[in-house]
């Protein structure tokens, strides 16, 4: 654990989400010494639809991640799409490989952190960025435990509201992103959503959509994403969520005994 008074790393990465762990694994496999720091302790959850596209799966293959080690991995064979008019179509995926999957971020991110450790990355949890100072041979980064870590290169993988980017004056003030999303896990799913990936393009959500992504054990990740246009307040978003959960095509897909777990999460 390189800290104040110890040898610097070649690469210091702040943020151990998929971007940070991918950078860490790639750098370590290239022969660089890598320290990966995150403010959380893993496993930890993130608001996400949990879907993995074909390109994401290929990247995970390149990183050496083994899907068989993740209990809550669910392979998807296609998608059921519902148009604003109510017409539904099934779009199959090729059957000769893995082209889409659903994996909770709780499990995926933790698996990537463990993969990083396995290739020699020094992973430090429960540590938050405070400040940085650039110098002739690299950068010195101060954390909330009072330690300073030196590195030749710093990778800011600390999210959309990156404290590192903000410390460098590179974050636009008041920017909340272009999209807003709600998500909640559902258990005891007995309808088609237990095994099918659904995407609903309801008219009032366009150009966004609602989804139900299947998970093992008759669970699903259910949510919606809409374009942030400045006319919808947080309360409006919550009303949209409550209304969406009453729509027939969604309740039918989940089944009559579906149970919503805990509370919903929103982003941003």
Regions found by a protein language model. Give the residues of each.
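Beta1/beta-strand and adjacent pyrophosphate-binding region of the FAD-binding site
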Residues: 4-19
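Conserved N-terminal helical subregion
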Residues: 6, 58, 74-75, 80-167, ...
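Small-residue (primarily alanine) positions within well-ordered alpha-helices
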Residues: 16-19, 23-28, 116
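Conserved Rossmann-like nucleotide-cofactor binding loop
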Residues: 19, 42, 161
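Glycine-rich FAD pyrophosphate-binding loop
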Residues: 28-48
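N-terminal FAD cofactor-binding segment of flavoenzymes
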Residues: 47-80
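FAD/FMN-dependent oxidoreductases across multiple families
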Residues: 72, 148, 230-268
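Conserved FAD-binding catalytic core of PHBH/FMO-like flavoproteins
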Residues: 160-250
């Amino acid at each position: 654990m390189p800290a104040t008074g110890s040898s610097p790393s070649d690469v210091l990465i702040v943020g151990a989400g998929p971007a940070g762990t991918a950078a860490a694994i790639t750098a370590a496999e290239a022969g660089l010494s890598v320290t990966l720091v995150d403010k959380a302790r893993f496993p930890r959850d993130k608001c996400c639809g949990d879907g993995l596209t074909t390109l994401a799966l290929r990247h995970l293959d390149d990183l050496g991640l083994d899907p068989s080690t993740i209990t809550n991995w669910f392979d998807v064979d296609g998608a059921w799409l519902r148009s604003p008019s109510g017409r539904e179509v099934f779009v199959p995926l090729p059957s000769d490989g893995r082209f889409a999957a659903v994996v909770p971020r709780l499990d995926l991110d933790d698996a990537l952190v463990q993969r990083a450790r396995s290739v020699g990355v020094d992973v430090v949890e429960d540590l938050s960025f405070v400040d940085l100072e650039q110098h002739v041979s690299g950068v010195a980064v101060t954390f909330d435990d009072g330690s300073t870590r030196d590195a030749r290169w710093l990778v800011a993988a600390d999210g959309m509201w990156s404290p590192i980017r903000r410390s460098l004056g590179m974050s636009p003030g008041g920017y909340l992103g272009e999209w807003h999303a709600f998500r909640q896990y559902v258990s005891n799913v007995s309808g088609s959503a237990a095994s099918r990936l659904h995407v609903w393009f309801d008219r009032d959500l366009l150009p966004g959509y609602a989804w139900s992504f299947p998970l093992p054990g008759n669970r699903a990740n259910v949510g919606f994403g809409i374009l942030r246009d400045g006319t919808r307040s947080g309360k409006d978003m919550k009303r949209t969520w409550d209304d969406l959960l009453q729509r027939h095509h969604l309740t039918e897909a989940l089944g009559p005994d579906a149970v919503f777990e805990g509370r919903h999460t929103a982003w941003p």
